[in-house]
Structures are given as structure tokens and as C-alpha cells.
């Protein structure tokens, strides 16, 4: 019998037999009901709130939490308070976060009996936070945003020196100063009533600030000068009411070679660092 004849015979036989076998993947009414029940059960699980963790688990988590999280967790409930206020738990924190206090409290009688480790760590964390909050913010401007203009005149002699901030290089612990080369202007040590001014300009001359303008009664190769107080600011990190312009002359024999300008604090007569100068200047150059 050929393959074609066999196929036709089999098809005819199936048509004559109404009780054919069901396929395993055939969707019956029973399967539909079962699928609906399973979907409903899954949906109920998705909308059911998870049960809170056991208090034993909470105690295991405690040693891995930071002091701030522990303090917040201890206020959630009575059970949480017992877990996260344990003296043994808080006692381990000084050694890892505040080594100075850890060394102090190990000494006999250093910690009063009434003082809990939780209170001790809370005070230490608060002190550290206050310290961080009192740190000055980064300046909004940089030296590359600024141009410094120094003007020196006496009688018919005059010198104008322009310094681009981008060309100035300072070390991390170096104090700010501007050096103006006036060697070719003919200023001599015996000159009287020498006028000096120091201007700062924001990029592309968007804003200008007259830092200092003064008249030096007599050039003297032995000493420097201080200008009047600089304009005050409301910047708590750099109080302009205590700042003065500092001028240091440099002579080559009797000829004025260079003039160095800086900003000094009149309380200790020390020049300011670069970032402090930028914080001061931004009060006048940036809205």
C-alpha cells in the first residue's frame, strides 16, 4: 500500500470515530476555571502587605547600621526601640566612627555611669555635623574668570599692568598675591604722593570692582604699606570689614622694580589664601 493511500485511509478512519483522544494542550473548560483560580490567588498575594520582620532579625541588622539610621529606627516602635537602643550595639560604634572618644572612654572613670553610649555617639555625630556645616562653600568663581588691573602713577609717570587670572598659578597652601612689573616706568624711591589702584574685572568686563585706591605719601625701599580697609561684605567666611589691601614694593637699587598686591586680615596681618580671596570677590562680582 502506498504512502498516499495509507494517509487517506487513516483520515477516513478518524472521521468515522467520534470518540477521538483529546490533545494534551487542548484548552478545556476545566483548565480555564483552574487558570482563573490561579490568577486570582496570585493577584491576592500581590496586594497583600508583607508581614513585618521578626524582632530577632531586627537585632541582627543593627550592627550594620550607621548611628543616624539606628536613632531613627529606635523611634519606630517599642520593639524596635529595644532592639536599636541596646548598649552593646551602641558601644561598638565609637571605635569605628569616633576613635578619639573610644580611646577616652576606655580610661577608668572617663564615662559617667549615667551616660549611655547612645547619648555619647549622638553628641559626637552632632558635633561632626556642625563642623561640616560650618565649612565654607566652594567659590562660585575661579581665577580664570578674573582680570586684575594695577595702576601706579606719580606726576607724569604712569604704569598700567594687566594680569589675566588664568595665567596665575598658586600652590594649595600658597597665599594670594598679584605682582606688577613697573621697572620700565621710571619710579624712584624719592618720589612723593604715588597713587595706586587695584581693579578686578569679571570675564569680558561683565562686572568691575575697585578693590583698592590709595595715595602713598613716600616710596620707601625699607617698608611696605597698607591701604584703607576694603569694602565690607556679609560673607561670614571672609569678613571684609577686617580686610585691608597690602602693598609691597620691590626696588632695584633706587628704581621701583615691582609692586606686589595682596589682601590681608587686619586681625593677624596675614594674607588670605586664594579661595578666601575668591569668596570675597564674588560678593561684588556675582549676583
From Swiss-Prot:
What taxonomic ancestry is recorded? Eukaryota, Viridiplantae, Streptophyta, Embryophyta, Tracheophyta
Q: Which gene encodes it?
A: NSFBx
Protein's UniProt name: Probable F-box protein At5g04010
Q: Which residues form the F-box domain?
A: 50-101
The record's annotation in InterPro entries points to: F-box-like_dom_sf (IPR036047), F-box_dom (IPR001810)
Amino acid at each position: 500500500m502506498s504512502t498516499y493511500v495509507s494517509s487517506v485511509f487513516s483520515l477516513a478512519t478518524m472521521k468515522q470515530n467520534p470518540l477521538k483522544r483529546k490533545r494534551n494542550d487542548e484548552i478545556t473548560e476545566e483548565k480555564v476555571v483552574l487558570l482563573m483560580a490561579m490568577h486570582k490567588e496570585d493577584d491576592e498575594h500581590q496586594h497583600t502587605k508583607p508581614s513585618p520582620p521578626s524582632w530577632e532579625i531586627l537585632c541582627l541588622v543593627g550592627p550594620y547600621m550607621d548611628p543616624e539610621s539606628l536613632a531613627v529606627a529606635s523611634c519606630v516602635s517599642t520593639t524596635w526601640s529595644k532592639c536599636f537602643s541596646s548598649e552593646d550595639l551602641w558601644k561598638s560604634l565609637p571605635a569605628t566612627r569616633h576613635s578619639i572618644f573610644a580611646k577616652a572612654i576606655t580610661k577608668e572613670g572617663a564615662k559617667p555611669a549615667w551616660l549611655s553610649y547612645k547619648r555619647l555617639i549622638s553628641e559626637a555625630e552632632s558635633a561632626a555635623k556642625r563642623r561640616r556645616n560650618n565649612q565654607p562653600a566652594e567659590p562660585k568663581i575661579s581665577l580664570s574668570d578674573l582680570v586684575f588691573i594695577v595702576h601706579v602713577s606719580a606726576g607724569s609717570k604712569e604704569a598700567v599692568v594687566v594680569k589675566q587670572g588664568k595665567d596665575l598659578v598658586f600652590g594649595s597652601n600658597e597665599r594670594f598675591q598679584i605682582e606688577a612689573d613697573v621697572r620700565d616706568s621710571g619710579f624712584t624711591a624719592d618720589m612723593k604722593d604715588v597713587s595706586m589702584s587695584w581693579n578686578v574685572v569679571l570675564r569680558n568686563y561683565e562686572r568691575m570692582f575697585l578693590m583698592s585706591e590709595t595715595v602713598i605719601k613716600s616710596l620707601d625701599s625699607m617698608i611696605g604699606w597698607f591701604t584703607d580697609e576694603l569694602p565690607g561684605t556679609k560673607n561670614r567666611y571672609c569678613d571684609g570689614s577686617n580686610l585691608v589691601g597690602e602693598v609691597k614694593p620691590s626696588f632695584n637699587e633706587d628704581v621701583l622694580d615691582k609692586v606686589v598686591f595682596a589682601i590681608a586680615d587686619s586681625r593677624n596681618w596675614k594674607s588670605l589664601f586664594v579661595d578666601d580671596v575668591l569668596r570675597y570677590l564674588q560678593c561684588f562680582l556675582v549676583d
